[in-house]
Curated annotation (Swiss-Prot):
Description of the deletion phenotype: RNAi-mediated knockdown causes embryonic lethality. Embryos are arrested at the one-cell stage. During the first mitotic division, embryos have defects in mitotic spindle formation, and centrosome duplication and positioning. Chromosomes are decondensed, disorganized and accumulate due to a lack of cytokinesis. RNAi-mediated knockdown at the larval stage causes in F1 embryos a loss of chromosome separation during meiosis I and no formation of polar bodies. During meiosis, impaired cortical granule exocytosis. Immediately after fertilization causes a reduction in cyclin cyb-1 protein levels.
Alphabetically ordered keywords of this record: Cell cycle, Cell division, Chromosome, Cytoplasm, Cytoskeleton, Meiosis, Mitosis, Ubl conjugation
Protein's name according to its UniProt entry: Securin-like protein
One GO cellular component term noted in the UniProt record for this chain: cytoplasm
Disordered, as annotated region: 31-53
Oligomer and partners: Forms a complex (via C-terminus) with separase sep-1. Interaction with ify-1 stabilizes sep-1. Also maintains the complex in the cytoplasm during interphase and recruits it to chromosomes during the first meiotic division. Interacts with E3 ubiquitin-protein ligase etc-1.
One GO BP annotation of this record: polar body extrusion after meiotic divisions
GO molecular function: protease binding; ubiquitin protein ligase binding
PTM annotation: Ubiquitinated by etc-1 likely at the onset of anaphase, resulting in its degradation.
Function: Acts as a chaperone and as an inhibitor for separase sep-1. Plays an essential role in maintaining chromosome cohesion prior to meiotic and mitotic anaphase, in cytokinesis and in organizing the spindle and the centrosome. Ubiquitination-dependent degradation at the onset of anaphase is likely to activate sep-1 resulting in the proteolysis of the cohesin complex and the subsequent segregation of the chromosomes. Also required for cortical granule exocytosis.
Domain of life the protein comes from: Eukaryota
């Protein structure tokens, strides 16, 4: 039985599962035969012919321990401080102060020559400072503070208007007339109408009818006044309701 070759016997090939079964019966070691199988995208994937071969392969790959690299550890030291009991003061690092050396005007101009287009003028001003002429001008410089009262007085003086001693003036009309040569006459104000008070009899508020005794004539006069008022209100209401 050991010399029998199941693949060469017969006209049909024995399935791999049956061949492995016979080999197991004969005591031979089962060898996993792998054949390339083509996937749907044209890729060749090696798969085992035995049932559960893929799961065995995945299990074997999962049991492999990946190689580990040893990393050098950095020792870290910790130190605890107690703020309440520790009186030690940490040393403060001293900061070196840069000494400022005096620089001559010529060196300053030489350094500015490569960076400033006015280096020649700066050098000339520094070397010939005493030879400069001082020009005095009567114009007011722009940087000075201008007093508004002074500027107002100058503006009034240019216009020929006399400056008021106090503000507001007591008689502005007469002062303005004097300043601008206006002649004020009483005839100019004659067109203004005078206020005239009209004398008429106002109604009396009646608090108690029993206390106020009115004659028949006075009662009729009061009723006529009320009727006139009602008529006037009716006329106003009619005018308001008229279409435009």
């Amino acid at each position: 039985m050991e010399d029998l070759n199941f693949e060469e016997r017969g006209s049909t090939q024995i399935p791999a599962s049956l061949q492995q079964h016979f080999s197991a019966k004969l005591g031979r070691q089962n060898e996993l035969e792998k054949t390339p199988s083509r996937g749907g995208l044209g890729l060749v994937v090696n798969s085992s012919k035995t049932p559960g071969g893929k799961s065995l392969q995945s299990l074997a790959s999962a049991c492999k321990v990946p190689p580990s690299t040893k990393k050098n550890t950095i020792p870290i030291a910790f130190e605890c401080y107690e703020d309440e009991t520790d009186d030690q003061i940490a040393d403060v690092a001293t900061i070196k102060k840069t000494e400022k050396h005096p620089c001559s005007p010529i060196d300053t101009a030489n350094r500015c020559e490569t960076f400033d287009s006015l280096a020649a003028d700066i050098e000339d001003d520094m070397l010939n400072l005493e030879d400069q002429d001082v020009v005095l001008s009567e114009d007011r410089p722009y940087g000075d503070v201008i007093d508004p009262a002074e500027s107002e007085a100058e503006a009034l003086a240019e216009l020929g208007v006399e400056e008021w001693d106090s503000y507001p003036p007591i008689d502005p009309a007469s002062r303005i007339g004097d300043d601008f040569n206006y002649v004020l006459r009483t005839e100019d104000f004659a067109e203004e109408g005078d206020v005239k008070l009209e004398e008429t009899r106002h109604r009396t508020v009646i608090a108690d009818i029993d206390e106020v005794k009115m004659s028949k004539a006075e009662r009729n006069e009061l009723f006529s006044m009320l009727a006139d008022d009602l008529d006037s209100y009716d006329l106003l209401a009619e005018e308001a309701n008229l279409p435009l």
